[in-house]
């Protein structure tokens, strides 16, 4: 197979080739390392690439394959977001304020290694994962492989840029307010925010006051399912998510909703709105019952989300070895968060139950809710460079208003690549499922992928 085609083949196909002996783990890794050396100076997807260590891991994986061992990801390379600990490597959180190297792997990394994955390196993030654009004073700007003067999104922007450009077959991201779904939308990828606590955050349990989760960034639904099966901590049948991605979803009742959950005035783009109704037409053609209905978003939704968001950032800032080295904008946001007490956080966490029940009441009648992905396309690199904390947040939330509410409720939500906007940049629609029902989202997303394939699309920088 041509090296470029191999780079874009996807993790599931690569795992099969490795198991069948049609490919070796060192050969596959070298495809990615060579592409990184050639392309990543343009993108800055990676903060660090572990060339020697990854090569040693690939050699060890091949020895296990040669000995007849078979694991779901044995020999498959993966990129890790730089808010997740890898033993012997610094976790920077996109900041100059970081401390020394981690002494042990995070639980999610341990699970990936147990499944046989080869760790390529760590991907870039905005400082403390705050913004939906991946730019920091410490590590520069990560660029979108579809258009180099645009952001890939954030905060998992490095992970998404790497997968989109064929610098990794799959990547680990995290999502506390859209940080998987935003960059997957703008990079043309499938991204899944799993159910809260589906994947371990250890040693950073409770990140962002319960809002944040880890999850997969992938070219295809099957690749994401493979990663989810390898990392889930919730007991269930072995391989349940790969099985879900391979089955038909059955006839579902699906609600289309374009109502913006935020109290701020937001104008969603015409193409982004049209994508929802186009998705509805396709879903009807596929045999589903489709209605137009909005969830009940209480006015207090963001009064619950925002204090937890700000306090989470304040906690992260306090945990830095050198908080004085944080960017001024980050310090300002952290100061806002410091005004919210532990008692206030406990009250908000308790109130979440009632809020979530009200928002989730729509799922008494429907299986899945479809919304726009982002409201507009990605910002230009440096667009917010001279802005302060509050003005930046007010502007960026208008681009991505459909994501945060589902971090509050904790249920799974995925973005499915749809089309391209007038600037030739990817768009998506968001699928929201019932609590703990990633399986239905994966089955439905795979059905959409079969009807409207996207994994073959390659950006200009690839």
Swiss-Prot record:
Q: Which UniProt keywords apply?
A: Hydrolase
- Name the enzyme's class: hydrolase
| The EC number(s) this enzyme carries | 3.5.1.4
> Which SUPFAM superfamilies does this chain map to?
Amidase signature (AS) enzymes
Q: List GO molecular-function terms, semicolon-separated.
A: amidase activity
Return the PANTHER family for the record: GLUTAMYL-TRNA(GLN) AMIDOTRANSFERASE SUBUNIT A, MITOCHONDRIAL (PTHR11895:SF7), TRANSAMIDASE (PTHR11895)
- Would you identify the family this protein belongs to, as annotated? Belongs to the amidase family.
Query: In the UniProt entry for this protein, what further remark is given in the free-text comments?
Result: Was identified as a high-confidence drug target.
What this protein is called in its record is Putative amidase AmiB2
What organism is recorded for this protein? Mycobacterium tuberculosis (strain ATCC 25618 / H37Rv)
Q: Which gene encodes it?
A: amiB2
